[in-house]
A protein has these predicted regions:
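Acidic/aromatic-lined carbohydrate-recognition and catalytic surfaces
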Residues: 7-191, 202
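Active-site regions of oxyanion-processing enzymes, predominantly non-cytosolic
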Residues: 206-209
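Transmembrane beta-strand segments of Gram-negative outer membrane beta-barrel proteins
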Residues: 1-5
Length: 209
């Protein structure tokens, strides 16, 4: 006995004929778009249910590039740096991907960041270090020779991690990096709801989001 249904087939642009063939072969009752792609009109016309991925907090660079202080943030920890004198420089971005992360230079670093003497475990008083925002380096001026130091600092996420993975894995070349945004911020939250509402109106062919 042959039955159909309960199977969703992923598809993407320029894949209409093979999608039709596989849908018939495997008895698919629904088709969804692959991440970062759109379905061809020929696929939409197959008469299957359409599942569509919608990303409420990315893929709108026209908005977030005007509000770059409203991207998500993370705390990062630098590598340990050995002080060879009473001053030591700790580079913030060594080991981090600069296309994905950017130090938050907007908020007061002495309020939100932390420099730690890893040899003693003590937090260095904020008066004992300064940030060079041009070099993304913390200058520790109250160091103890032969002690190791780290910096915990806030950074903006400027490339959505999932989209970055797909971009690099699929070799999307010069496709614009999608910048994520944080709906904690009222203006961005309103933008997210407004654009989703408009997307629903513009996507009557979609059965399941």
């Amino acid at each position: 006995m042959t039955s159909t249904g309960r199977f969703t087939l992923p598809s993407e642009e320029n894949f209409a004929e093979k999608t039709k063939e596989l849908a018939e072969l495997w008895g698919a009752d629904a088709i969804r778009n692959s991440d970062g792609t759109h379905l061809d009109e020929a696929v939409l016309a197959l008469g299957k249910k359409i599942y569509s991925a919608y990303f409420p907090t990315r893929a709108h660079n026209e908005w977030i590039t005007l509000h770059m202080d409203e991207t998500p943030q993370v705390y990062l920890l630098t590598a340990r740096i050995l002080a060879e004198s009473n001053a030591v420089d700790v580079p913030l971005m060594d080991g981090f991907f600069e296309e994905q992360l950017k130090p938050n230079r907007d908020a007061d670093p002495h309020k939100y960041w932390e420099v730690v003497d890893r040899t003693t475990g003590e937090v260095v008083d904020p008066s004992g270090w300064t940030l060079d925002p041009g070099e993304d380096t913390v200058h520790v001026t109250a160091a103890v020779p032969l002690h190791e130091y780290t910096v915990s600092f806030l950074a903006y996420i400027i490339w959505d991690p999932v989209e970055m993975y797909n971009h690099l894995t699929n070799d999307w070349g010069d496709k614009e990096h999608e910048i994520p945004f944080d709906i904690y911020h009222p203006a961005t939250r309103k933008f997210v709801f407004d654009t989703f509402d408009q997307w629903l109106k513009d996507s009557p062919q979609v059965d399941v989001v």
